[in-house]
């Protein structure tokens, strides 16, 4: 972006190119504001941040431009306002309600901008995050769905590498009770109230030495999510969590992939 917060036209063209790849394959595509948030970003959730109004204005200008650029795309293109927005202390959970309310405010800004746009945007499906996209009970409880001009077009997304010690490779064991607990919270806080939920990121770091255990974990995770009607998206980052080699289009862990596809 330039000094006037205008997105580089070549960048938008590249995003469009990738979006078109996805849609041309008959898939649904999600665009979000990604690493503008997080530990290395510029947009933070701090209630006492003197820079917030400037950050919020920049956030709004991004979505005004993106909404207009893609306004005539079909409902197969979904917008997601944020990704794992943190405070400046980089806390991933256990933050105050006031901090979560900053995220709620940004989510409302996002919805308002898209709905005031033209084309297919007034009815487009929009995805929202909790603080840090956290599946912790406190952050989910302090999340508030924005007001919208149309019904049943908002979806909550959380990220859940659960249990984190296993998913990050720190431990080679896990407890299914950890998975049961956070999904039960998702159900009680949102799904029972007819709010749709997706797990926008999940996964486990890959290596063949514990492939059987990881396949077992993924199978249980997805089966549990399926009982609540939750769709899950593996975080294939091309790095530690990758399950597909993008250079030669081959599966790195076909046993794991086959097991997940069987559940899905």
Regions found by a protein language model. Give the residues of each.
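An active-site-proximal structural segment forming one wall of the substrate-binding cleft
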Residues: 1-35, 39-81, 102-117, 224
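Short linear interaction motif-like sites in intrinsically disordered regions of transcription factors
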Residues: 12, 43, 64, 93, ...
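Hydrophobic beta-strand scaffold residues
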Residues: 29-31, 197, 232
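Short, solvent-exposed turn/loop segments enriched in Gly/Ser/Thr/Pro and often Arg
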Residues: 34-37, 132, 233-241
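Short secondary-structure boundary/hinge segments and terminal tails
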Residues: 40-41, 208, 242-243
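Extracellular glycoside hydrolase catalytic/binding regions
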Residues: 61-77, 84-230, 245-251, 255-261
């Amino acid at each position: 972006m330039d000094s006037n917060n205008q997105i580089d036209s070549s960048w938008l063209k590249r995003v469009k190119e990738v979006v078109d790849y996805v849609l041309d394959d008959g898939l649904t595509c999600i665009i979000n504001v990604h690493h503008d948030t997080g530990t290395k970003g510029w947009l933070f959730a701090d209630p006492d941040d003197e820079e917030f109004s400037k950050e919020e204005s920049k956030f709004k200008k991004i979505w005004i431009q993106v909404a207009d650029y893609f306004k005539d795309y079909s409902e197969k293109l979904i917008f997601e306002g944020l990704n794992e927005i943190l405070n400046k202390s980089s806390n991933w959970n256990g933050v105050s309600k006031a901090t979560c309310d900053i995220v709620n405010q940004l989510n409302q800004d996002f919805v308002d901008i898209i709905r005031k746009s033209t084309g297919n945007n007034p009815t487009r499906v929009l995805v929202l995050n909790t603080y840090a996209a956290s599946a912790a009970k406190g952050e989910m409880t302090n999340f508030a769905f924005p007001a919208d001009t149309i019904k049943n077009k908002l979806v909550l997304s959380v990220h859940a590498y659960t249990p984190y010690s296993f998913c990050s490779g720190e431990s080679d064991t896990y407890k299914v009770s950890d998975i049961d607990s956070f999904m039960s919270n998702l159900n009680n806080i949102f799904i029972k109230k007819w709010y749709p939920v997706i797990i926008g990121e999940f996964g486990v770091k890959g290596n063949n030495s514990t492939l059987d255990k990881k396949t077992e974990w993924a199978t249980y995770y997805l089966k549990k999510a399926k009982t609540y009607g939750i769709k899950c998206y593996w975080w294939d980052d091309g790095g530690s969590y990758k399950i597909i080699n993008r250079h030669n289009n081959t599966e790195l862990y076909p046993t794991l992939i086959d097991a997940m596809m069987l559940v899905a």
